[in-house]
Amino acid sequence: MTRAWLTLVLFLVSTSALAQTHTPRLIDVHMHYDGEPGILDQVLVKLEAADGIAFLLTTPKGFPQANKFIQEHPDRFIGFGDIKLDDPDVLHQIDRFHAAGFRGLGEITMTRKPYDDPAYWPIYDRADKYHMILLFHTGIVNRLHPQEPADVSFDRSRVTRLDLIARHWPNLIIIGAHLGNPDYEEAGEIGRWNPNLYFDVSGTTLIKKKADYRFFQSIFWWTAVASPHTPASGASAFEKLVFGSDVFGGELDEFDSAQARYHAMLDDCEVPQSVQAKIFSGTMWHILQLQQAQAPSKDVNQGKQ
């Protein structure tokens, strides 16, 4: 490792700690960035107004710009590495994102095998080693170019694929995007038994369920239930949710629209404001604090691997 690279790594490590000194009002766990020009400045304005933090899901294409911006605004952005599980150099990519101070990986999607296939276990081992949060796409997968052949299957990304991962790596924090759309009941049940598994309800779920938001009371049903058949907890079942906007392609209107839909659903379900505060920021803020305390110091020798 050259002296210049070592200096850069040490600088990134020194700036990777949480810069916020108070619990923000909003943490968006699901914001994509692929190098779109000018978008980061616009996102920053929205985050400043909301007293928010965004997990910036950064592709290799967007990495140079995002990494610089995150270092300049560590109180508003946390880096996530947008990796492809089937890339032959994926472990090296994880090392690179970790060395840059990124705190998680995702959105993981469009894999050639099911998420819980043993072929991907070395990737989860590496994430576990670095205490990185994993964000998985769950449920139906979009098809933006229907005229082109694609090796993509909804079945590989079913939310039930996260159950084995959550059990096998009990210290990994896992977020399932989209609440498994349309497999909501399965999502709720595996979330109920896996304390390290959370969900966002970004995407189309809160659009198609707009006329029946109370439906989610049947998914998150176990609040205050005393039974040997469900984990003992004083927490609201809705605390399995965290906020995600799923902004992509620079469509920033979705940042505001997603918040409005979340609030409408939670209000219809009579979720207390104290619990809503956890969903919008408190739960994830607590996780980030624990992650920072538990994470090993960055290995400046990993570049020699």
Task: Mark where each language-model region is.
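Mid-to-C-terminal alpha-helical segments outside catalytic/metal-binding sites
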Residues: T2, Q20-H30, G38-I53, P228-V242, ...
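Sec-dependent signal peptide recognition
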Residues: T2-L10
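N-terminal signal peptide c-region/cleavage motif recognized by signal peptidases
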Residues: S14-S16
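Active-site gating/metal-coordination segments in enzymes
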Residues: T21, K61-R156, T205-L206
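Divalent metal-dependent hydrolysis catalytic cores, especially in the metallo-beta-lactamase
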Residues: L26-V29, Q42-K61, F77-D82, R103-T109
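Histidine-centered divalent metal-coordination motifs
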Residues: H30-D34, H137, H178, D246
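Alpha-helical scaffolding segments of alpha/beta enzyme cores, especially the outer helices
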Residues: Q42-V45, Q65-K68, H92, R96, ...
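Catalytic pocket-lining loop regions of alpha/beta-barrel enzymes
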Residues: G104, D117-V242
